[in-house]
A protein has these predicted regions:
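Short, positively charged and aromatic/hydrophobic N-terminal segments
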Residues: 9-13, 17
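C-terminal binding/interaction regions
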Residues: 25-45, 98-169
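Short beta-strand scaffold segments in enzyme catalytic cores
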Residues: 51-60
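Hydrophobic "anchor" residues
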Residues: 64-65
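Compact, glycine-rich, soluble single-domain proteins
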Residues: 70-84
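Active-site- and interface-proximal helix/loop "cap" or "latch" segments in soluble metabolic
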Residues: 79-83, 89-98
Length: 169
């Protein structure tokens, strides 16, 4: 996990004490949180569908922010997580597949303990969408600005061989 700490106005990572993170870069997490929070308004869409009770924001490679919300139905196969909906919004609206940063939550920001982690299906989807997503930062604790990468969550992902084969062909 990556922890950030501040010295004066500069931010540093715990992994590499010499790496400076620009102060305006720190604002991206607040912007993402606020954009996702706009989507949070749990509602019963119909007697069969419940939505907007989990929300997500992702930052695409070009810096644009895309959001998503969870949709659950009484038929589980039609459920879609906020995470995948945000990624699909990114792809549908820009054609991008690489995700730089990710935050997901219910009624409050992630506070450690796995409260904002993508589920296994979403982790798999992110890997399949773009191999480079293994380096996406996933918010673990919003107040501490603690993150983890997809690669750290799934260090032995099965699809790396297929990506390697595709590159060699």
């Amino acid at each position: 996990m990556q922890k950030l700490f501040c010295r004066g106005k500069a931010w540093y990572t715990e992994r590499d004490n010499s790496e400076v993170v620009e102060e305006n870069q720190m604002d991206i997490w607040k912007r993402m949180y606020e954009k996702a929070k706009e989507q949070y308004h749990p509602e019963e869409v119909s007697p069969f569908i419940y939505a907007h009770h989990v929300v997500c924001a992702i930052e695409a490679e070009n810096g644009d922010i895309y959001t998503g919300f969870c949709i659950e139905s009484c038929s589980g196969v039609m459920n879609i997580c906020a995470d995948r909906l945000a990624a699909l919004n990114m792809y549908a609206n820009s054609g991008q597949t690489k995700i730089k940063r990710f935050i997901a939550f219910r009624d409050s920001a992630p506070n450690g303990g796995g409260s904002g982690m993508p589920c296994g299906a979403c982790q798999e989807f992110f890997y399949q969408l773009n191999e480079a997503n293994e380096d996406m930062e996933i918010m673990v604790d919003y107040e501490k600005r603690e993150t983890i990468t997809l690669k750290e969550l799934m260090p032995n992902w099965w699809g790396k061989e297929r990506y390697a084969e595709a590159k060699s062909n």
